């Protein structure tokens, strides 16, 4: 399982490198477009522009694939963690069986306490891993941050995108934020329960 996790992370890194290379190639093609236009060679500029767009799309596709592989790696990491917790719970269950067969109430009570602690730890691990997996996917990226980054880049380059951003559905970011807050509150309560 650890080998699989390593391979997934390695593959994600390779895909990210391919995305960066495609982006670099796209910028090189854009420079060729500029040069061709300066030389009044519109036909060559059009070919270079097509290449630039193709390379840019290729880079975005590599990046999407890298994100998906990274999400799978997070799920495998969750499985590895859950395997360890499950093993610990199995050991506690065996100890409980032994204590019950001996009918020593103190041992039974001690084992039950350990078992309850393992169950609470499992809940916390599950919650944390689910949060990390959901944050690894691009679907849970806060829309407000995405919009802010787009506006920042547009302002730096003198581009107009505010009209396009205003066409997004209202409340797109609020749903993600309330979901994250409720998960954080739930996790905080569980952590407080573990401390007590």
UniProtKB/Swiss-Prot annotation:
Pfam family of the protein (one): Snf7
Residues the record lists as Phosphoserine modifications: 101, 173
Gene Ontology MF term list: protein domain specific binding; protein homodimerization activity
Tissue: Highly expressed in adult heart, kidney and liver. Expressed at lower levels in adult colon, spleen, lung, brain, testis and muscle. Also expressed in myoblasts and embryo fibroblasts.
GO biological process, one term: multivesicular body sorting pathway
Coiled coil: 5-42, 102-124
One term under GO cellular component: nuclear pore
UniProt xrefs under Gene3D superfamilies: 6.10.140.1230
Cellular compartment(s): Cytoplasm; Endosome membrane; Nucleus matrix
N-acetylmethionine: residues bearing it: 1
Extent of motif MIT-interacting motif: 185-195
Cell cycle among keywords: yes
Membrane disposition: Peripheral membrane protein
Keywords: Acetylation, Cell cycle, Cell division, Coiled coil, Cytoplasm, Endosome, Membrane, Nucleus, Phosphoprotein, Protein transport, Repressor, Transcription, Transcription regulation, Transport
Function: Probable peripherally associated component of the endosomal sorting required for transport complex III (ESCRT-III) which is involved in multivesicular bodies (MVBs) formation and sorting of endosomal cargo proteins into MVBs. MVBs contain intraluminal vesicles (ILVs) that are generated by invagination and scission from the limiting membrane of the endosome and mostly are delivered to lysosomes enabling degradation of membrane proteins, such as stimulated growth factor receptors, lysosomal enzymes and lipids.
Subunit organization: Probable peripherally associated component of the endosomal sorting required for transport complex III (ESCRT-III). ESCRT-III components are thought to multimerize to form a flat lattice on the perimeter membrane of the endosome. Several assembly forms of ESCRT-III may exist that interact and act sequentially. Self-associates. Interacts with CHMP1B. Interacts with VPS4A. Interacts with VPS4B. Interacts with PHF1. Interacts with IST1. Interacts with MITD1.
Family: Belongs to the SNF7 family.
Protein's name according to its UniProt entry: Charged multivesicular body protein 1a
Species of the source: Mus musculus (Mouse)
């Amino acid at each position: 399982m650890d080998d699989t996790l390593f391979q997934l992370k390695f593959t994600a890194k390779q895909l990210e490198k391919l995305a960066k290379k495609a982006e670099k190639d796209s910028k090189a093609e854009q420079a060729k477009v500029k040069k061709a236009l300066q030389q009044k060679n519109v036909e060559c500029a059009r070919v270079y522009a097509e290449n630039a767009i193709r390379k840019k799309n290729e880079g975005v596709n590599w990046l999407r694939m890298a994100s998906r592989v990274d999400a799978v790696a997070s799920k495998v990491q969750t499985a590895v963690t859950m395997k360890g917790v499950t093993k610990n719970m199995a050991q506690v269950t065996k100890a409980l069986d032994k204590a019950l067969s001996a009918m020593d109430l103190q041992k039974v009570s001690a084992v039950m306490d350990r078992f309850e602690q393992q169950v609470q730890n499992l809940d916390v691990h599950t919650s944390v891993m689910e949060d990390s997996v959901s944050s690894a996917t691009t679907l849970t990226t806060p829309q407000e941050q995405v919009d802010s980054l787009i506006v920042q880049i547009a302002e730096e380059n003198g581009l107009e995108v505010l009209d396009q951003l205003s066409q997004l559905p209202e409340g797109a970011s609020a749903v993600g934020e309330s979901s994250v807050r409720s998960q954080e509150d739930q996790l905080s309560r569980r952590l407080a329960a573990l401390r007590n």
